[in-house]
């Protein structure tokens, strides 16, 4: 699943949005399944994939999808930050910043 995620990032960075969407979809499906069995290990991967999916959807002007993904990512990251603020508060702040930018550009 990390290979799918990395491949999706490559496609996103090279503006191959359709391929990036396919890879993020697959990575998210795998991470969600893994998080069901072991949330303490994989929830952060779900949040990170949702966050990057939101960037993709924002870049492709699908703002409603991006908002949903940022919001879900933020919920997960806030939960993680409650348990380990040092490790996850920066992720919460970054997600809030991107969500604010999305609302500004909508």
Model-derived segments and spans:
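Ser/Thr/Pro-rich low-complexity tandem-repeat tracts
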Residues: 12, 27, 71, 84-86, ...
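Conserved alpha-helical positions within TPR/SEL1-like repeat arrays
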Residues: 1-13, 44-59, 90-105
């Amino acid at each position: 699943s990390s290979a799918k995620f990395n491949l999706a990032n490559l496609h996103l960075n090279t503006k191959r949005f359709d391929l990036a969407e396919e890879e993020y979809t697959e990575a998210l499906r795998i991470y969600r399944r893994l998080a069901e069995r072991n949330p303490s290990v994989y929830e952060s991967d779900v949040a990170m994939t949702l966050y990057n999916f939101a960037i993709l959807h924002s870049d492709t002007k699908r703002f409603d999808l991006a908002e949903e993904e940022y919001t879900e990512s933020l919920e997960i990251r806030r939960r993680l930050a409650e348990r380990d603020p040092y490790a996850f508060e920066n992720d919460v702040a970054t997600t809030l910043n991107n969500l604010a930018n999305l609302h500004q550009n909508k």
